[in-house]
Amino acid sequence: MFGPPTPRQDAEYTAFVLSASSSLTRTAWLLTGDSDLAAELVQEALVKTYLAWRRVRHGEATAYARRILVNLNIDRWRRRPATPSEELDRAVLNGAEQAVDDRDEVARMLATLPQQQRRVIVLRYYNDLSEADVAGHLGISVGAVKSAASRGLATLRTQYTPVSGGGQ
């Protein structure tokens, strides 16, 4: 069960990476708000997935890698020294200096959420996971997922300002 992967397993892993990399990268970017850090987290998650490839169940590789990605982000956040909200400050400055497209606006809004709410919103609504799957990925109860999603969405609604010129 341990030892180097077989050529067949290498081929399966390569196919997995080709099919899952962009989704994992988008998830990491939404979790971090930083493309360089997102790429670093994805790379580390893919290495850990490769090392465990013999134990990964067929059909669950993306969920396995996503769980590693979320855990790496949690670990990074825990090890980060406490500093004022530099992500929020950076997003506010960027928003004041230039018009942002919808994707950047969503990222800015997500950056203002507490990490737990941000993780729940990204996994639940961006990755379209069920509440039970989100709970499993984050190691929390379904009730905690519902609560974090409700609070996170309420916060996002207060920040959202629709573009004028519509039919209202």
What are the roles of these predicted feature ranges?
Residues R67-L88, A99-D102, T158:
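Arg/Lys-rich amphipathic alpha helix in sigma70-family domain 2
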Residues T25, S35-A52:
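Conserved RNAP core-binding helix
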Residues V70, L138-P162:
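DNA-recognition helix of helix-turn-helix
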Residues A15, E105-L113:
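Short amphipathic alpha-helical boundary/capping segments
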Residues M1-R26, D36-A39, R118:
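A short, charge-rich alpha-helical start-of-domain segment used by transcription regulators
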Residues Q43-V47, G59-R79, A149:
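Σ70-family region 2.3-2.4 aromatic/basic alpha-helix that recognizes the −10 promoter
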Residues A111, Q115, N127-A144:
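Helix-turn-helix DNA-binding module
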Residues V120-R124:
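A short pre-motif secondary-structure segment
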